[in-house]
């Protein structure tokens, strides 16, 4: 487990603020049946902290307690036991909720509104004035690649396009804490890569991101620290380097070597390690990188598509400044 720093304002080794944004202690959630008998222990005695500017991953298989934890962080569910603080307050506090952006696992959208009307509706819930709503909607729709679909209603969108508009609504209030539950579900590899890049950009701006996912690649690509759930319990927590390092294994990468040179190197290694395993192979490109390369070539050839476009840079109002708003 990673120890929490004694000074809440200190800087971590990676340069990120150690100010604690989310504090969870002894968090437990037991769902009961009609008669009040325990039916399922979804979350069981969980402890963790999330720091300002950190991308914190909740990783685990389906049904491991990730989404239940997220709902308690949002104040949508009461814990059976334990304590949660978000920005030093209860997650049910109105001022706390105003500083949070949330993308649920299934986006709840009004199917007869178009994308601009959808963002205007959610912006109005945060009491943004009309000019701010219009400006932010324009920037967000460009950012998520939906600025060419303004006249289409959300009900006509594919699932991937609905995820994009869902992400835009989660950012309409310029939140200090962004909670994303399976943000890449239904997205094509291009959209997945853009979402990951956006998450990194938000963290660089000083925002805190909690990412709940069962997809290993999502978590591995963007998270500073990860907690792994199974059976409602934390099985492991730490930085990716701490969790993934294999101190008893060494990898050496070289250009292609002549066969004679390779044989000499292998002979030296085998003489040194005895019966230990030695493996020689050629590195391969991962499928995501190859797919993106193919699509990029098609885009450069000016091939047309009627779906979502590639997203643009991070919305201007999300990039300006690094200071979070006061509570």
Model-derived features with residue positions:
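ABC transporter nucleotide-binding domain
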Residues: 194-284
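Walker A (P-loop) phosphate-binding loop of ABC-type ATPase nucleotide-binding domains
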Residues: 61-65
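Conserved catalytic motifs of ABC-family nucleotide-binding domains
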Residues: 174
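Catalytic Walker B motif of ABC-type/P-loop ATPase nucleotide-binding domains
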Residues: 178-182
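Conserved ABC transporter NBD signature motif
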Residues: 82-96
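Conserved ABC ATPase "signature" region
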Residues: 120, 124, 132-149
């Amino acid at each position: 487990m990673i120890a929490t720093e004694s000074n809440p304002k200190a800087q971590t080794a990676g340069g990120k603020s150690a100010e604690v944004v989310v504090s969870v202690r002894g968090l437990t959630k037991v769902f009961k049946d009609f008669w009040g008998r325990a039916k399922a222990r979804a979350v069981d005695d969980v402890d963790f902290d999330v720091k300002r500017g950190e991308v914190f991953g909740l990783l685990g298989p389906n049904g491991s307690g990730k989404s239940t934890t997220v709902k308690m962080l949002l104040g949508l569910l009461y814990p059976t036991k334990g304590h949660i603080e978000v920005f030093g307050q209860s997650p049910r506090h109105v001022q706390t909720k105003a500083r949070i952006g949330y993308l649920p696992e299934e986006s709840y959208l009004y199917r007869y509104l178009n994308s601009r009307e959808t963002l205007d509706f959610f912006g109005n819930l945060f009491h943004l004035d009309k000019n701010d709503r219009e400006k932010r909607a324009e920037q967000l729709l460009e950012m998520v690649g939906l600025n060419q679909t303004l006249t289409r209603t959300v009900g006509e969108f594919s699932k991937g396009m609905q995820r994009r508009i869902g992400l835009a609504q989660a950012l309409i209030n310029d939140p200090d804490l962004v909670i994303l539950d399976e943000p890449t579900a239904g997205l094509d590899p291009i959209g997945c890569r853009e979402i990951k890049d956006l998450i990194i950009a938000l963290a660089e701006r000083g925002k805190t991101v909690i990412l709940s996912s069962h997809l290993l690649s999502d978590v591995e690509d963007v998270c500073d620290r990860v907690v792994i759930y199974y059976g409602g319990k934390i099985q492991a927590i730490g930085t990716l380097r701490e969790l993934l390092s294999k101190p008893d294994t060494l990898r050496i990468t070289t250009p292609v070597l002549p066969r004679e040179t390779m044989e000499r190197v292998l002979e030296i290694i085998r003489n040194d390690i005895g019966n230990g395993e030695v493996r020689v192979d050629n590195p391969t490109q991962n499928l995501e990188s190859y797919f993106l390369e193919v699509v990029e070539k098609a885009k450069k050839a000016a091939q047309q598509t009627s779906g979502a476009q590639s997203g643009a840079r991070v919305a201007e109002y999300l990039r300006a400044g690094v200071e979070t708003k006061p509570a």
